[in-house]
Amino acid sequence: MAPKKAKRRAAAEGGSSSVFSMFDQTQIQEFKEAFTVIDQNRDGIIDKEDLRDTFAAMGRLNVKNEELDAMMKEASGPINFTVFLNMFGEKLKGADPEDVITGAFKVLDPEGKGTIKKKFLEELLTTQCDRFSQEEIKNMWAAFPPDVGGNVDYKNICYVITHGDAKDQE
């Protein structure tokens, strides 16, 4: 391991392992999968370039350095998996699950329209982490049909995930 990487990795070890008691094993595995997706260069540390590459993979090519710097400053040092888990633990304390899920979708909706493209969502769901089967995709589109423009209302999806039934259309 290069000295620079060793120094970064050693500095990242500062995260507390007690955060692992906040989540069950399934949740920890899901966070690990998300961490792995973001850690584009697979060095065990999320850095500014990993964030830039992750945004690029999602189609957002013009992320400003200031935005990336602000994200990196949310951590007190290098972001290894324990620090990543700690950050989510802090963010999720007392949070409404619907708000948390909606917040995750909002990352994919930089224009704040409340919708995301069907094609993009389908690509994410079939190529990242716990991949959807074609049958699961078909069932999802039956439950949450996109509009004529190919947009999916993610707020309705979030509501159903957290409440178990479709929200009445206003």
From Swiss-Prot:
One of its GO terms (cellular component) is myosin complex. SMART domains: EFh. Pfam families: EF-hand_6. It comes from the Eukaryota. Ca(2+) binds at D39, N41, D43, D50. InterPro entries: EF-hand-dom_pair, EF_Hand_1_Ca_BS, EF_hand_dom, Myosin_RLC. The modification Phosphothreonine is found at T26, T36, T102. Myosin is a hexamer of 2 heavy chains and 4 light chains. Plays a role in muscle contraction. This is Myosin regulatory light chain 2, skeletal muscle isoform. It comes from Bos taurus (Bovine). The gene is MYLPF.
